[in-house]
Structure formats: structure tokens, C-alpha cells
């Protein structure tokens, strides 16, 4: 495991219980999206991974090493293998792009003759080799974040922490940054933890996700699994799943999830013909994830109980996930 958080508790001096019994693992090469509402504990969690925050109790292991047991110099060295980017970039305004990236190497005591070539390599990686003499005030938000990404990768980390790294960007720039991170992850075989409150970020970038609410991890799994079958109420809210279509006049309203090959099959049409039952399609959409597409339909079966039951058994036999929406 690249990251292991074990039985983490975080209680601040004012008594606020920010994290409660958190256990979390990150495998090599995974991109984990940590999503939740404001105040849920997301930023506290990510800052524990590189010990910018220290837990009240529990263990923080990165590549098998308990960071909480390291001496200050040992911790400083370990942090060099953990890159981090933030919402507001944290660039040095008095230094140009080249100098901002080089600064991370100078702190790590790289040899001067190696710094120049490394900075050029990093700026080429993030597409800013033509901006090396620009200052932060001359850059767009997306360009500033690209500089921050280059700086975070300076010391060849195997883990990248992203704390709301796209929250200050517009949707087009967000897409470009996520595309960049996805490409970098593949090229460098990075593991990434990405804190966000935007479900679109998780859909576009991540293969794993966890949902945090009131300091607790309430759901954890692959993005595909959770989008297909969310369990917790907070997860359903974040995914935009509501029960407004279910009412007391009609209890036969269902949400059907279509995965992979089923997306192109005329399943509802076949069901209608086979069981002579009317189906009212209330809503539908397709989510494009990093691993595969997932389709959703909210339908009402307009038949008697026996007909509806046969239709449900047919859908279940096909391996579809069917959830009855409650009022």
C-alpha cells in the first residue's frame, strides 16, 4: 500500500472532532477521489497524509513507513516523495516560473548543474516551457496550477496530494488540468489522492473514491461500483440521486442501472414485448466514467403486481441493478 491511515482520530483544541475512526488505503497507481460537503473533514484528512496535520491518535503509513514516528529530518526527507498542490497555487510572486519550480529543488539540495535540466523537463511535462520567464501575475489560473504541478513533481514523488486543486478554475480549465494529471499519472506511475466537492472531478479523473461526512468515511469503493450502487444517503445526494419521482399514488417507480454492454441493448423494449407490460420512462442519463459508462433509467411499471414482479425478475436475471424508489 502507498498510503494507510489506521484508526485516525483528529480532535482540535477547541473540542471539534474533525475525523472519527478513519481507516483508508491507497494502492500503487490508484487515483482516489475524496469527496464530501464543506466541513466534512476532507482537507484535514489529506493534510494528515504528509503530516502537515498530526492526528490525535492513529497511524499514518506512507510506503509502509509510519510518518508519526519519524524525526524531523527524516520526516522532511519523506515529504520530498509526497507532492502536493492546493486550490490557490501558493506560488512565490517575486519569482518567475523557472525559479518557482527550481525553488523546490534548491530546498532539497539538488546540485546546481542538475536543477536547470530538471526544471526544463518539468516545464515541458506541464506544457509551460515557453512561459519559464513569466511571473505569476502574468499567468492565467490554469497556468499557475500547471506551475504548481511541476513544482510538486520536482523531487520525483510517487504520491501526489491534490487539495481542491481545480476549485478556483472554470470548467474548461478544470478539464485541461484533469487531463494533464491523468497523463502524468500514467507516464510517471503516480498514486494520487484528490480532495474535491465536485462529482465531475471524480468522474473524469478517478478510479477509486470515498465519501466523507461529518469526519467519517461513509462509503468507499471503485468509482464504477459506487456510481452503480450508492449505499449512503450523502453519496446519493452527491450523485444527484433523489426520490422525487416516487409518491404515494404509485409505488412502482424504480431506478435501473445499465453497465457496459447493456447500454446498447433494447432491454426496456424487449421487456415490454415479452411481458405485455407498459413502462413509463420518467428520466434517464449516462455517466461517462474513467473505466466505463453507466446508464440510468427511472421508470414506472404500469401493470399489476404479478406483471411487475416478472419484469423485475427479468431485469435481475440480466444482471442489472434495480432499486425501488421510496416516497
UniProtKB/Swiss-Prot annotation:
GO cellular component annotations of the record: plasma membrane
Entry EC number(s): 7.4.2.11
Domain of life: Bacteria
Record: residues binding ATP: 36-43
Alphabetized SUPFAM superfamilies for the sequence: ACT-like, P-loop containing nucleoside triphosphate hydrolases
GO molecular function, a single term: ATP hydrolysis activity
Top EC category: translocase
Role this protein plays: Part of the ABC transporter complex MetNIQ involved in methionine import. Responsible for energy coupling to the transport system.
Assembly, per entry: The complex is composed of two ATP-binding proteins (MetN), two transmembrane proteins (MetI) and a solute-binding protein (MetQ).
Protein name: Methionine import ATP-binding protein MetN
Species this protein is from: Helicobacter pylori (strain ATCC 700392 / 26695) (Campylobacter pylori)
Gene: metN
Amino acid at each position: 500500500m502507498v498510503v494507510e491511515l489506521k484508526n485516525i482520530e483528529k480532535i482540535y483544541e477547541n473540542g471539534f472532532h474533525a475525523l472519527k475512526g478513519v481507516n483508508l488505503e491507497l494502492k500503487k497507481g490508484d487515483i482516489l477521489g475524496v469527496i464530501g460537503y464543506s466541513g466534512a473533514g476532507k482537507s484535514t484528512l489529506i493534510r494528515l497524509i504528509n503530516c502537515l496535520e498530526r492526528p490525535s491518535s492513529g497511524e499514518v503509513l506512507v510506503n509502509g513507513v509510519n510518518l508519526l514516528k519519524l524525526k524531523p529530518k527524516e520526516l522532511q526527507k519523506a515529504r520530498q516523495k509526497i507532492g502536493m498542490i492546493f486550490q490557490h497555487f501558493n506560488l512565490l510572486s517575486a519569482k518567475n516560473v523557472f525559479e518557482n519550480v527550481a525553488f523546490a529543488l534548491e530546498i532539497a539540495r539538488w546540485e546546481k548543474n542538475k536543477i536547470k535540466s530538471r526544471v526544463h523537463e518539468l516545464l515541458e511535462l506541464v506544457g509551460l516551457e515557453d512561459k519559464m520567464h513569466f511571473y505569476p501575475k502574468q499567468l492565467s489560473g490554469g497556468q499557475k496550477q500547471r506551475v504548481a504541478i511541476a513544482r510538486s513533481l520536482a523531487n520525483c514523488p510517487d504520491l501526489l496530494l491534490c487539495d481542491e486543486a481545480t476549485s478556483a478554475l472554470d470548467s474548461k480549465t478544470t478539464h485541461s488540468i484533469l487531463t494533464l494529471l491523468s497523463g502524468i499519472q500514467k507516464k510517471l506511475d503516480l498514486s494520487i489522492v484528490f480532495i474535491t466537492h465536485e462529482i465531475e472531478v471524480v468522474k473524469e479523473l478517478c478510479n477509486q473514491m470515498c465519501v466523507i461526512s461529518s469526519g467519517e468515511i461513509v462509503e468507499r469503493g471503485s468509482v464504477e461500483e459506487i456510481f452503480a450502487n450508492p449505499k449512503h444517503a450523502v453519496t446519493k445526494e452527491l450523485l444527484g440521486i433523489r426520490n422525487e419521482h416516487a409518491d404515494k399514488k404509485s409505488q412502482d417507480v424504480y431506478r435501473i442501472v445499465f453497465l457496459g454492454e447493456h447500454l446498447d441493448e433494447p432491454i426496456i423494449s424487449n421487456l415490454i414485448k415479452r411481458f405485455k407490460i407498459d413502462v413509463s420512462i420518467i428520466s434517464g442519463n449516462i455517466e461517462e466514467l474513467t473505466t466505463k459508462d453507466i446508464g440510468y433509467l427511472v421508470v414506472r411499471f404500469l401493470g399489476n403486481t404479478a406483471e411487475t414482479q416478472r419484469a423485475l425478475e427479468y431485469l435481475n436475471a440480466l444482471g442489472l441493478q434495480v432499486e425501488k424508489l421510496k416516497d
